[in-house]
Protein backbone atom coordinates (compact mmCIF):
# COMPACT_ATOMS: atom_id res chain seq x y z
CA UNK A 1 0.00 0.00 0.00
CA UNK A 2 2.85 2.39 0.84
CA UNK A 3 4.51 1.70 -2.52
CA UNK A 4 1.26 2.26 -4.36
CA UNK A 5 0.65 5.49 -2.52
CA UNK A 6 4.14 6.78 -3.27
CA UNK A 7 3.68 5.91 -6.93
CA UNK A 8 0.37 7.75 -7.04
CA UNK A 9 1.96 10.80 -5.44
CA UNK A 10 4.96 10.94 -7.81
CA UNK A 11 3.04 10.12 -11.00
CA UNK A 12 1.71 13.66 -11.59
CA UNK A 13 5.15 15.08 -10.85
CA UNK A 14 6.83 12.76 -13.35
CA UNK A 15 4.30 13.68 -16.03
CA UNK A 16 4.93 17.37 -15.45
CA UNK A 17 8.69 16.88 -15.77
CA UNK A 18 8.25 14.82 -18.95
CA UNK A 19 5.98 17.42 -20.54
CA UNK A 20 8.48 20.17 -19.71
CA UNK A 21 11.23 18.13 -21.33
CA UNK A 22 9.16 17.60 -24.48
CA UNK A 23 8.30 21.27 -24.68
CA UNK A 24 11.92 22.27 -24.24
CA UNK A 25 12.96 19.88 -27.00
CA UNK A 26 10.44 21.54 -29.35
CA UNK A 27 11.31 25.03 -28.27
CA UNK A 28 11.95 27.41 -31.13
CA UNK A 29 14.91 29.75 -31.00
CA UNK A 30 14.55 32.52 -33.54
CA UNK A 31 17.32 34.87 -34.64
CA UNK A 32 16.56 37.75 -36.96
CA UNK A 33 19.50 39.51 -38.64
CA UNK A 34 17.73 41.12 -41.60
CA UNK A 35 19.06 44.33 -43.16
CA UNK A 36 22.31 44.29 -41.21
CA UNK A 37 24.50 44.65 -44.32
CA UNK A 38 26.34 41.47 -43.34
CA UNK A 39 28.76 40.04 -45.90
CA UNK A 40 29.31 36.84 -43.90
CA UNK A 41 27.07 34.66 -41.76
CA UNK A 42 27.75 35.60 -38.11
CA UNK A 43 29.65 32.96 -36.18
CA UNK A 44 28.46 34.08 -32.73
CA UNK A 45 24.80 33.12 -33.09
CA UNK A 46 23.34 30.77 -30.51
CA UNK A 47 24.13 27.20 -31.44
CA UNK A 48 20.61 26.08 -30.53
CA UNK A 49 19.00 28.44 -33.03
CA UNK A 50 16.21 26.79 -35.01
CA UNK A 51 14.92 29.65 -37.17
CA UNK A 52 17.52 31.93 -38.74
CA UNK A 53 16.59 34.88 -40.95
CA UNK A 54 19.52 36.52 -42.76
CA UNK A 55 17.52 38.21 -45.51
CA UNK A 56 18.45 41.53 -47.15
CA UNK A 57 22.20 41.33 -46.54
CA UNK A 58 25.29 40.86 -48.73
CA UNK A 59 25.96 37.18 -47.98
CA UNK A 60 27.43 35.06 -50.81
CA UNK A 61 27.47 31.59 -49.20
CA UNK A 62 31.19 31.16 -49.82
CA UNK A 63 33.41 28.61 -48.09
CA UNK A 64 33.53 30.57 -44.84
CA UNK A 65 29.74 30.89 -44.75
CA UNK A 66 29.38 27.16 -45.37
CA UNK A 67 31.67 26.26 -42.46
CA UNK A 68 29.82 28.59 -40.08
CA UNK A 69 26.44 27.35 -41.26
CA UNK A 70 27.38 23.74 -40.47
CA UNK A 71 27.60 24.64 -36.76
CA UNK A 72 23.90 25.51 -36.61
CA UNK A 73 22.81 21.92 -37.02
CA UNK A 74 19.48 22.43 -35.19
CA UNK A 75 18.13 24.77 -37.84
CA UNK A 76 14.67 23.97 -39.15
CA UNK A 77 14.15 27.16 -41.16
CA UNK A 78 16.74 29.25 -43.03
CA UNK A 79 15.95 32.45 -44.92
CA UNK A 80 18.50 34.07 -47.24
CA UNK A 81 16.17 36.26 -49.29
CA UNK A 82 17.76 39.02 -51.40
CA UNK A 83 21.45 38.43 -50.75
CA UNK A 84 24.40 38.05 -53.13
CA UNK A 85 24.34 34.29 -53.64
CA UNK A 86 25.35 33.21 -57.16
CA UNK A 87 26.39 29.55 -56.76
CA UNK A 88 25.03 26.80 -54.55
CA UNK A 89 28.09 24.65 -53.88
CA UNK A 90 28.24 20.95 -53.11
CA UNK A 91 27.46 20.11 -49.46
CA UNK A 92 26.60 23.73 -48.73
CA UNK A 93 23.88 22.57 -46.32
CA UNK A 94 25.24 19.11 -45.58
CA UNK A 95 25.04 19.25 -41.78
CA UNK A 96 21.54 20.74 -41.59
CA UNK A 97 19.72 17.43 -41.39
CA UNK A 98 16.77 19.00 -39.50
CA UNK A 99 16.16 21.78 -42.01
CA UNK A 100 12.57 21.86 -43.30
CA UNK A 101 12.31 25.25 -45.01
CA UNK A 102 15.00 26.84 -47.21
CA UNK A 103 14.27 30.15 -48.90
CA UNK A 104 16.93 31.61 -51.22
CA UNK A 105 14.68 33.75 -53.41
CA UNK A 106 15.70 37.02 -55.09
CA UNK A 107 19.42 36.32 -55.34
CA UNK A 108 21.52 35.90 -58.50
CA UNK A 109 21.87 32.12 -58.49
CA UNK A 110 22.80 30.75 -61.90
CA UNK A 111 24.63 27.52 -60.93
CA UNK A 112 23.36 24.76 -58.65
CA UNK A 113 25.98 22.06 -58.30
CA UNK A 114 25.07 18.39 -58.32
CA UNK A 115 25.37 17.86 -54.56
CA UNK A 116 24.12 21.24 -53.39
CA UNK A 117 21.24 19.73 -51.38
CA UNK A 118 23.03 16.72 -49.94
CA UNK A 119 21.97 15.94 -46.38
CA UNK A 120 18.64 17.77 -46.52
CA UNK A 121 16.61 14.62 -46.01
CA UNK A 122 13.85 16.43 -44.07
CA UNK A 123 13.53 19.47 -46.31
CA UNK A 124 9.87 20.07 -47.16
CA UNK A 125 9.85 23.51 -48.78
CA UNK A 126 12.45 24.87 -51.21
CA UNK A 127 12.18 28.40 -52.60
CA UNK A 128 14.48 29.30 -55.51
CA UNK A 129 12.29 31.99 -57.03
CA UNK A 130 13.53 35.09 -58.87
CA UNK A 131 17.07 33.99 -59.59
CA UNK A 132 19.00 33.49 -62.83
CA UNK A 133 18.73 29.72 -63.14
CA UNK A 134 18.76 28.55 -66.76
CA UNK A 135 18.84 24.78 -66.31
CA UNK A 136 18.50 22.25 -63.53
CA UNK A 137 19.78 18.71 -63.49
CA UNK A 138 17.03 16.39 -62.33
CA UNK A 139 19.40 14.58 -59.96
CA UNK A 140 19.85 17.76 -57.91
CA UNK A 141 16.51 17.00 -56.26
CA UNK A 142 17.13 13.30 -55.59
CA UNK A 143 18.34 13.81 -51.97
CA UNK A 144 15.17 15.78 -51.16
CA UNK A 145 13.04 12.76 -50.37
CA UNK A 146 10.63 14.73 -48.15
CA UNK A 147 10.19 17.72 -50.45
CA UNK A 148 6.56 18.81 -50.86
CA UNK A 149 6.84 22.35 -52.21
CA UNK A 150 9.17 23.68 -54.92
CA UNK A 151 9.11 27.28 -56.11
CA UNK A 152 11.06 28.06 -59.31
CA UNK A 153 9.10 31.14 -60.31
CA UNK A 154 10.84 33.96 -62.17
CA UNK A 155 13.96 32.25 -63.50
CA UNK A 156 15.30 31.60 -67.02
CA UNK A 157 14.41 27.91 -67.24
CA UNK A 158 13.30 26.61 -70.65
CA UNK A 159 12.88 22.92 -69.82
CA UNK A 160 12.94 20.71 -66.73
CA UNK A 161 13.44 16.99 -66.32
CA UNK A 162 11.68 15.56 -63.31
CA UNK A 163 13.30 12.58 -61.55
CA UNK A 164 11.26 9.52 -60.59
CA UNK A 165 10.06 9.32 -56.99
CA UNK A 166 9.55 13.07 -57.02
CA UNK A 167 6.37 13.32 -54.98
CA UNK A 168 5.68 17.04 -54.79
CA UNK A 169 2.37 18.47 -53.72
CA UNK A 170 2.83 22.01 -55.02
CA UNK A 171 5.15 23.42 -57.69
CA UNK A 172 5.45 26.99 -59.00
CA UNK A 173 6.86 27.43 -62.50
CA UNK A 174 5.44 30.62 -63.98
CA UNK A 175 7.68 33.46 -65.12
CA UNK A 176 10.19 31.23 -66.94
CA UNK A 177 11.12 30.92 -70.62
CA UNK A 178 9.44 27.60 -71.31
CA UNK A 179 10.24 25.97 -74.64
CA UNK A 180 7.17 23.91 -75.43
CA UNK A 181 8.83 21.65 -77.98
CA UNK A 182 9.43 17.94 -77.42
CA UNK A 183 11.93 18.69 -74.63
CA UNK A 184 9.02 19.71 -72.37
CA UNK A 185 7.04 16.54 -72.93
CA UNK A 186 8.32 14.71 -69.84
CA UNK A 187 7.49 17.64 -67.56
CA UNK A 188 4.02 17.98 -69.03
CA UNK A 189 3.41 14.26 -68.68
CA UNK A 190 4.47 14.38 -65.03
CA UNK A 191 2.24 17.39 -64.30
CA UNK A 192 -0.76 15.59 -65.78
CA UNK A 193 -0.22 12.14 -64.28
CA UNK A 194 1.03 12.91 -60.76
CA UNK A 195 -0.81 14.42 -57.81
CA UNK A 196 1.17 17.65 -57.93
CA UNK A 197 -0.62 20.99 -58.15
CA UNK A 198 0.76 23.56 -60.58
CA UNK A 199 0.38 26.95 -58.92
CA UNK A 200 -0.83 29.74 -61.20
CA UNK A 201 -1.37 27.26 -64.00
CA UNK A 202 -3.22 29.76 -66.17
CA UNK A 203 -0.22 32.11 -66.37
CA UNK A 204 2.48 29.45 -66.71
CA UNK A 205 2.73 29.97 -70.45
CA UNK A 206 4.96 28.81 -73.28
CA UNK A 207 7.56 31.26 -74.54
CA UNK A 208 8.77 29.25 -77.56
CA UNK A 209 7.87 28.55 -80.28
CA UNK A 210 5.78 31.58 -81.16
CA UNK A 211 2.91 29.46 -82.43
CA UNK A 212 2.40 27.96 -78.95
CA UNK A 213 2.64 31.10 -76.83
CA UNK A 214 -1.09 31.04 -76.15
CA UNK A 215 -0.86 27.67 -74.35
CA UNK A 216 0.15 26.93 -70.80
CA UNK A 217 2.76 24.24 -70.30
CA UNK A 218 0.27 21.74 -68.89
CA UNK A 219 -2.13 21.74 -71.84
CA UNK A 220 0.09 22.53 -74.83
CA UNK A 221 -0.42 19.96 -77.64
CA UNK A 222 2.59 17.94 -78.76
CA UNK A 223 3.29 16.28 -82.07
CA UNK A 224 3.32 12.54 -82.56
CA UNK A 225 7.11 12.36 -82.76
CA UNK A 226 7.35 13.73 -79.22
CA UNK A 227 5.42 10.72 -77.94
CA UNK A 228 7.74 8.32 -79.74
CA UNK A 229 10.90 10.11 -78.66
CA UNK A 230 10.02 10.38 -74.97
CA UNK A 231 8.35 7.46 -73.18
CA UNK A 232 5.01 8.37 -71.66
CA UNK A 233 5.80 6.85 -68.30
CA UNK A 234 8.90 5.99 -66.34
CA UNK A 235 8.74 3.03 -64.01
CA UNK A 236 9.85 3.57 -60.47
CA UNK A 237 11.41 0.12 -60.23
CA UNK A 238 14.76 1.55 -61.29
CA UNK A 239 14.86 3.51 -58.04
CA UNK A 240 13.43 0.94 -55.64
CA UNK A 241 16.89 0.05 -54.40
CA UNK A 242 18.07 3.64 -54.35
CA UNK A 243 20.38 4.19 -51.39
CA UNK A 244 20.94 7.46 -49.55
CA UNK A 245 22.97 9.78 -51.69
CA UNK A 246 26.62 10.09 -50.71
CA UNK A 247 29.53 12.07 -51.98
CA UNK A 248 30.88 9.12 -53.93
CA UNK A 249 27.72 8.95 -56.04
CA UNK A 250 27.96 12.57 -56.98
CA UNK A 251 31.58 12.19 -57.95
CA UNK A 252 30.34 9.99 -60.81
CA UNK A 253 27.68 12.45 -61.92
CA UNK A 254 29.21 12.87 -65.35
CA UNK A 255 27.12 9.94 -66.60
CA UNK A 256 23.93 11.72 -65.59
CA UNK A 257 25.08 14.93 -67.20
CA UNK A 258 25.72 13.03 -70.42
CA UNK A 259 22.19 11.64 -70.33
CA UNK A 260 20.66 15.07 -69.86
CA UNK A 261 22.84 16.64 -72.54
CA UNK A 262 20.80 14.79 -75.17
CA UNK A 263 18.06 17.36 -74.68
CA UNK A 264 20.28 20.37 -74.23
CA UNK A 265 21.53 22.50 -77.12
CA UNK A 266 25.26 22.80 -77.44
CA UNK A 267 26.66 26.14 -76.40
CA UNK A 268 28.78 28.44 -78.54
CA UNK A 269 31.91 27.75 -76.53
CA UNK A 270 32.70 24.63 -78.60
CA UNK A 271 32.49 26.53 -81.87
CA UNK A 272 34.69 29.27 -80.45
CA UNK A 273 37.24 26.73 -79.23
CA UNK A 274 37.37 25.00 -82.62
CA UNK A 275 37.84 28.36 -84.32
CA UNK A 276 40.72 29.27 -82.03
CA UNK A 277 42.43 25.90 -82.61
CA UNK A 278 42.08 26.19 -86.40
CA UNK A 279 43.42 29.76 -86.35
CA UNK A 280 46.42 28.80 -84.24
CA UNK A 281 47.26 25.81 -86.45
CA UNK A 282 46.91 27.84 -89.65
CA UNK A 283 49.08 30.67 -88.31
CA UNK A 284 51.74 28.22 -87.13
CA UNK A 285 51.79 26.53 -90.55
CA UNK A 286 52.18 29.86 -92.36
CA UNK A 287 55.02 30.92 -90.05
CA UNK A 288 56.75 27.56 -90.55
CA UNK A 289 56.46 27.85 -94.33
CA UNK A 290 57.72 31.46 -94.29
CA UNK A 291 60.80 30.42 -92.33
CA UNK A 292 61.59 27.22 -94.19
CA UNK A 293 60.88 28.26 -97.80
CA UNK A 294 64.06 30.40 -98.28
CA UNK A 295 66.18 27.61 -96.82
CA UNK A 296 64.57 25.02 -99.05
CA UNK A 297 64.99 27.32 -102.08
CA UNK A 298 68.70 27.81 -101.40
CA UNK A 299 69.19 24.07 -100.98
CA UNK A 300 67.38 23.36 -104.28
CA UNK A 301 69.32 26.09 -106.12
CA UNK A 302 72.63 24.80 -104.79
CA UNK A 303 71.71 21.28 -105.83
CA UNK A 304 70.85 22.45 -109.38
CA UNK A 305 74.17 24.30 -109.70
CA UNK A 306 76.04 21.25 -108.49
CA UNK A 307 74.27 19.02 -111.01
CA UNK A 308 74.99 21.53 -113.81
CA UNK A 309 78.72 21.59 -113.01
CA UNK A 310 78.83 17.80 -112.95
CA UNK A 311 77.08 17.66 -116.34
CA UNK A 312 79.49 20.15 -117.94
CA UNK A 313 82.49 18.28 -116.60
CA UNK A 314 81.18 15.00 -117.97
CA UNK A 315 80.51 16.59 -121.39
CA UNK A 316 84.02 18.04 -121.56
CA UNK A 317 85.63 14.73 -120.64
CA UNK A 318 83.53 12.87 -123.21
CA UNK A 319 84.45 15.34 -125.96
CA UNK A 320 88.10 15.26 -125.07
CA UNK A 321 88.42 11.51 -124.90
CA UNK A 322 86.16 10.87 -127.89
CA UNK A 323 88.60 12.41 -130.54
CA UNK A 324 92.14 11.62 -129.37
CA UNK A 325 93.40 11.22 -132.98
CA UNK A 326 92.67 14.81 -133.84
CA UNK A 327 95.68 15.94 -131.92
CA UNK A 328 97.95 13.47 -133.75
CA UNK A 329 96.77 14.70 -137.17
CA UNK A 330 97.95 18.19 -136.53
CA UNK A 331 101.29 18.65 -138.36
CA UNK A 332 104.27 19.78 -136.47
CA UNK A 333 104.85 23.39 -137.21
CA UNK A 334 106.97 26.06 -135.88
CA UNK A 335 105.53 27.99 -133.01
CA UNK A 336 106.18 31.24 -134.79
CA UNK A 337 104.34 30.08 -137.91
CA UNK A 338 101.44 28.97 -135.78
CA UNK A 339 101.29 32.33 -134.14
CA UNK A 340 101.37 34.13 -137.44
CA UNK A 341 98.69 31.94 -138.91
CA UNK A 342 96.49 32.45 -135.85
CA UNK A 343 96.85 36.14 -136.08
CA UNK A 344 96.18 36.09 -139.78
CA UNK A 345 93.14 33.97 -139.43
CA UNK A 346 91.40 36.89 -137.86
CA UNK A 347 92.66 39.58 -140.18
CA UNK A 348 90.10 40.64 -142.73
CA UNK A 349 90.48 43.55 -145.15
CA UNK A 350 87.62 45.29 -146.88
CA UNK A 351 88.36 45.56 -150.63
CA UNK A 352 87.48 48.49 -152.81
CA UNK A 353 84.54 46.69 -154.31
CA UNK A 354 82.93 46.21 -150.89
CA UNK A 355 83.88 42.58 -150.43
CA UNK A 356 85.83 41.32 -147.49
CA UNK A 357 89.21 40.00 -148.49
CA UNK A 358 90.67 37.23 -146.46
CA UNK A 359 94.42 37.54 -146.30
CA UNK A 360 94.78 33.89 -145.48
CA UNK A 361 93.86 33.15 -149.07
CA UNK A 362 96.45 35.65 -150.29
CA UNK A 363 99.18 34.15 -148.23
CA UNK A 364 98.26 30.65 -149.40
CA UNK A 365 98.42 31.78 -153.05
CA UNK A 366 101.80 33.40 -152.49
CA UNK A 367 103.12 30.22 -151.02
CA UNK A 368 101.98 28.25 -154.10
CA UNK A 369 103.60 30.73 -156.48
CA UNK A 370 106.85 30.48 -154.62
Swiss-Prot record:
Record GO terms (molecular function): signaling receptor activity
Short name of any one Pfam family annotated for the protein: LRR19-TM
Tissue expression profile of the protein: Expressed in renal collecting duct epithelial cells.
Stretches forming LRR repeats: 46-71, 72-95, 96-119, 120-143, 145-168
GO CC terms in record: plasma membrane
Limits of the LRRCT domain: 176-227
Topological domain ranges for the Cytoplasmic compartment: 292-370
Topology within the bilayer: Single-pass type I membrane protein
Organism domain of life: Eukaryota
GO biological processes: host-mediated regulation of intestinal microbiota composition; positive regulation of canonical NF-kappaB signal transduction; positive regulation of non-canonical NF-kappaB signal transduction; regulation of cytokine production; regulation of inflammatory response; toll-like receptor signaling pathway
Activity regulation comment: Activated by TLR ligands such as LPS, bacterial DNA and peptidoglycan.
Signal peptide range: 1-24
Transmembrane stretches, start-end: 271-291
Glycan attachment sites: 32, 37, 62, 95, 179, 192, 195, 202, 251, 256
Topological domains annotated Extracellular: 25-270
Keywords, ordered alphabetically: Glycoprotein, Leucine-rich repeat, Membrane, Repeat, Signal, Transmembrane, Transmembrane helix
InterPro entries in UniProt: Cys-rich_flank_reg_C, Leu-rich_rpt, Leu-rich_rpt_typical-subtyp, LRR_dom_sf
Compartments, record wording: Membrane
Subunit annotation: Interacts with TRAF2 and TRAF6.
Function: Pathogen-recognition receptor which mediates the activation of TRAF2- and TRAF6 NF-kappa-B signaling pathways and induces the expression of pro-inflammatory cytokines. In kidney, prevents infection by uropathogenic bacteria by inducing the production of cytokines, chemokines and antimicrobial substances. In gut, involved in host-microbiota interactions, plays a critical role in promoting the recruitment of immune cells and intestinal inflammation.
Protein name: Leucine-rich repeat-containing protein 19
Amino acid sequence: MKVTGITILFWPLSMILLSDKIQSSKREVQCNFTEKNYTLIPADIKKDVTILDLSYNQITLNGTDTRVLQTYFLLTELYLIENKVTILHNNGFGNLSSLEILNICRNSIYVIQQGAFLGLNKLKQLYLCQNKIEQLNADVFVPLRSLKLLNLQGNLISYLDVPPLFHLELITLYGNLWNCSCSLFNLQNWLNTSNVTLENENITMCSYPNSLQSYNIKTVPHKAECHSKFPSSVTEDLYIHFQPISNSIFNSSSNNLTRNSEHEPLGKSWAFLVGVVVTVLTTSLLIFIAIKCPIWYNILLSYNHHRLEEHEAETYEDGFTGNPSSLSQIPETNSEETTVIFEQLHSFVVDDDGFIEDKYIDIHELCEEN
